[in-house]
């Protein structure tokens, strides 16, 4: 389960970087529902709600020792104003950030720690990964990886013993064949962020509803890619309309169909859909019972979408 949304608001200047409408009581119910329906991987970050997402995870999973917690570092944030204050990835900060995350999730061990700077140059990232390697040796984290959409960045670190995971954007709108191929060749787990296109692929915006201000999706489309001024991008809305019926094959909801599209892409792909309610968490987890979309449906979707060539990598 992706835990960006439950963290609530945080900001980059005047631009919202978090989700609106999060309610702590319902967020806790969502986390419990996810667990009860078979979810075992929970993805968060030190910046989600200025650490609030991690604290909620710590509370909800206090007696769930086999829960897999993935967290991220790389941005400094003012906890009082919830303002992002800039990238930080020097070794001392990496250690400090991991310590703070451990306190917030109330554990002495985090399963996977990811660098949360998508397009950081490889040479600048090296010291951070050296530090993470030392933290693996110290038993503080289980392994580490990079949240990046750049295959070359992941490839540059894949030789490291503790580098286990690449988190990247991928969904029915934006395929990522180069990253998938690399991850499979190198034996890396793929954590898929934005598997539901920040909500567009749930179908709940098909009736014209929009996201209010104070939400990351109400910001400029060139920053988050799926919404323009609080409404789904017109081209994505058209694509959603075109494939909606195919996604619901076998009794799936549109959201479950979109997740099953990802499951059909390979056994090393692990979508991390977000949820702000228990109902959403249960629905998302229900995709596991359906399993991958049938091959014939996958072909029909590709024929309808007529994707352009992948093109050069870019941050998504």
Predicted regions and their residues:
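N-terminal binding-site loop/beta-alpha segment at the start of enzyme catalytic domains
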Residues: 1-67
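Active-site mouth loops of central-metabolism enzymes
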Residues: 11-25, 80-95
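A short, structured active-site edge motif that brings together acidic residues
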Residues: 66-79, 113
